[in-house]
Amino acid sequence: MFTKKINFKLQSSLELLITLSFGLALLLPIVIIAFIQVSNSNTSLTAIESQQAASKLSSVATLVGSEGSPARQLVQINVPPGVENIYVGNTMVSGVGHEIIFQIVSVINSSYITTYTPVNVSGDLGGIATQGTYLVNVSAQSQCQGNPNVQCVYMQPVV
């Protein structure tokens, strides 16, 4: 009789262990999917905030560029987390171009948020790639620093 009681206890413990294993096997993929969804939503939020900041810089650059030199304006932008670098103009050739690029790096991938301006833009905003709120001086110049033969709008952070 004593052995039957032990076998019954072992059997119920084994059944409980199997039931818990099935529960964990079902719960683990749900937890992993939830973490992936949270990561995707954070990346999407960073992309949207970067798009807003780039559009703000682009519209101010267009306004200042249409007024011509010596027009200037201070603009406040919010740099979201995950921004690796901010490129203004064409950094490969002469530093003067028509685009503002936010490079976003996340756990999943790296992406670029780009806005175009009808005026030539140049500048150095790579130093403000960390999360925070910054003031950027946007000024129209008759001779651009990257290429003195071209008029452009120059962007630099206010220190």
Q: What is the role of each PLM region?
A:
Residues 9-10, 67:
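Histidine kinase transmitter module recognition
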Residues 11-25:
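N-terminal signal-anchor/signal peptide hydrophobic helix marking the start
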Residues 32-159:
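N-terminal export/assembly leader peptides and their processing motifs that target proteins to secretory
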Residues 1-9:
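N-terminal leader/signal peptides at the extreme start of proteins
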